[in-house]
């Protein structure tokens, strides 16, 4: 455990923000730097079958140290950080023995406050690693990367019985491309866990069904002084569309298993406008109903427009709820829960209000629930992680390996 914090601080010092709208994978050069560093560290650690694909997927194997019919398992984390907030020149602050109250982030006015983030009340006495208020931290998911690397070191350096352990580090998870080029067969695991969750105890195997909705609105612009009966204002049509979307079914008004419509961007002029929504729901039937609702709204608002003016709507499914794949293999969750209990952690089964690489991988034939990292408030300047939470994650990874070995002996 002595190198856990050192690894994490080294990894977050590298700018690995991914970039949307880029065809190449990985989308940024910084991700290659971390992947090459990890490859070197895996080689120094003595792992085998180390490969780094042209699409930036790094894989390696820790061979079994016991005999028996033990299934090969895997652990996966992503190296990129979110493009939503700066990940350049990350300057972490280490707050030892947190005593409560506000934590100043850097020298400005930014604070990490328990008023806004009540979870801090539960973390008294712990060591918190925060930002300086100018960048995100990168615990999502460099905490997971550091935890997997540290768990490998623990397994490698101690006589803990384990079967074959396969690890992978992926790029571009934050822009939805992380698992697209993942070779499940080459990975060689019967099942895996992404280490990409939040607070201690979280175990996630349910996620949103997700779709994107792109709306193009073509209007007609003329001089406002002579516009009566002629002008068709694309921006006004966009406003009418959004007014029809249920206001109480937005991200800021929903939680738990509740789905939502989210207007992610809107731009335009009188002549032309574009809107981008994302749709999310855990229930497949409700998910399909939300898509139909968007089509009905577009049809309603577009009714009776001049032939040269129109509303075009394109819906694309992004991913589905991995629950249907994971529940076919209940032992995967049983082992993870038992590992947590053995480490004096109460498992907290909760839905992912988002997605992970494990979602796509589960539908590619690799069941892959998500383990906690000990991090909070991802994708922004209030992101932080606890050292104790990271240590617990390492313990759980090691215990999962040990329990899987016992299962096969």
Curated annotation (Swiss-Prot):
The keyword tRNA processing does not apply. It holds the Pfam family Peptidase_M20. It is found in: Cytoplasm. The keyword RNA-binding does not apply. Belongs to the peptidase M20B family. GO terms for molecular function: metallopeptidase activity; tripeptide aminopeptidase activity; zinc ion binding. This is Peptidase T.
